Amino acid sequence: MLYLASRSLCRRQLLQRLDIPFQVIDLEIPEVRREDELPQDYVRRVAQEKAQVGLARVRDAFAPKVLGADTEVVLDGRVFGKPADLVEAAAMLAALSGRTHQVMTAVSLVAAGGVAAQVLVVSEVSFALLSQGQIARYVDSGEPMGKAGAYAIQGRGECFVSRLVGSYSGVMGLPLQQTAQLLTTFEES
């Protein structure tokens, strides 16, 4: 049985597109970047921790496989996680305005017996120049809260994106092509 270790409704909806039965494990993992930890190492570690903690919760299930994922926005080496408040959300959007940033999503798959696999997908996202009014209206909508980098590409935040190179679903939180390939490879090994 496949389990998704995530509180993200968006990840649940994305995984449903693969037509694979799964159950959700609702868990909270502290997402704190270690000093001197590279952004890509950070997202890989958090995704792996989510999967491992999820596996510990379903250890007694028959042949459990647990999928964990983490997504972060990175600009000039600085990691933009989920904003703590509206002020931080506005500051993140102002920093991203008119710039190109990376969206890193790591997906980890673990199973009983220590079997594990992982993929990291990095997408490049360019934002148009945003006015203070645009930022204020978007922040007031509430959409930036709970989103890495303070925007949802699948929502109103899409109108800020002038260019995307990479995985649209990866920017949303679960790169579907790579996740499908990971699951297929995992089953074959």
Curated annotation (Swiss-Prot):
One of its GO terms (biological process) is nucleotide metabolic process. It catalyses: a ribonucleoside 5'-triphosphate + H2O = a ribonucleoside 5'-phosphate + diphosphate + H(+); a 2'-deoxyribonucleoside 5'-triphosphate + H2O = a 2'-deoxyribonucleoside 5'-phosphate + diphosphate + H(+). Its main location: cytoplasm. CDD domains: Maf. Pfam families: Maf (PF02545). GO terms for molecular function: nucleoside triphosphate diphosphatase activity. The active site is at 70 (proton acceptor). Keywords: Cytoplasm, Hydrolase, Nucleotide metabolism. Its EC number is 3.6.1.9. Its cofactor is a divalent metal cation. The keyword RNA-binding does not apply. It comes from the Bacteria. InterPro entries: ITPase-like_fam (IPR029001), Maf-like (IPR003697). NCBIfam families: maf (TIGR00172), PRK04694.1 (NF003403). This is Nucleoside triphosphate pyrophosphatase. It comes from Xylella fastidiosa (strain 9a5c).
